[in-house]
Amino acid sequence: YAAVKVLTSSICPDDKKRYANGILSILTGEEEGIPQEYRWGAIGAWAWAGSRCVDYLETQPEFDAQKIAISGCSRAGKTALWCGAQDQRIAVVMSNVSGTGGAALERGKIGEHISDITTNYPFWFCKNYAAYAADEDAMPVDAHMLLAMAAPRPMYLASASVDVWADIQAEYTALRLASELYTLYTPGLILPERRPAANQPFHIGRIGYHIREGIHDLTFYDWTCYMDFCDSYLK
């Protein structure tokens, strides 16, 4: 394997005051007539950069462009899911402790809510996301739909056992709901109703998942699980 890092600070600064100084100063959405409330935030810009990396890798003979995976942790986990959802060239979609705005269902979620994330990081998302801060149930979509957009490609999610802010149950429930679409490609695929114990990863059909013992983080254990999953599909 080879690793390619997307340096987000060079694309769109992760800063409430400076985020529009990067690529968003050029790709404003104004020319396309996109209303202000629906225009990209930083996560959209970072995901765009991920696809531009794929563009480059396709031109380099030392890489197999049919075997590209994407991953990220926390805000980068949200980004990986969004990039993977939009770019079908990505063969394996992986995300680590992505929580609100990522793999976790908004409805019934504990820990971080839309009101929290849009107060602390309003620039990550389009402005319309904050319209559901007071009524998450009114949002017409939820995380399982984002996850399902990876199908039929292999998808791997990871949570952390004491990551209450991300809500591991909301992440796992979204994964189970998304798996219903995967049954169109893998008949009989059924994920366990109860989430697995910590450090007990599973691969079922084209879906992988684990809960790592510990806090909101990305560790060597997580990478080991990701590589084991990729071995099944990319080697």
Regions picked out by a protein language model, each given a short descriptive name:
Residues Y1-E62, E106-R107:
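Cap/lid segment of the alpha/beta-hydrolase catalytic domain
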Residues E30, S95-L146, E171-E193:
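Mobile cap/lid helix-loop segments that gate and shape the active-site cleft of serine hydrolases
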Residues A42, S74-G77:
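Active-site loop->helix "elbow" adjoining a glycine-rich segment at hydrolase catalytic centers
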Residues G50, E58, G77-Q88:
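Short glycine-enriched nucleophile-adjacent loop
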Residues E62-S74:
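Alpha/beta-hydrolase fold nucleophile elbow
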Residues A130, L175-K235:
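C-terminal catalytic histidine-bearing segment of alpha/beta-hydrolase fold enzymes
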Residues M149-M155, H203-I207:
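Short, proline-enriched alpha-helix->beta-strand connector loops that line the catalytic pocket
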Residues A151-I168, R212-I215:
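Conserved strand-to-loop "acid loop" that flanks and positions the catalytic carboxylate
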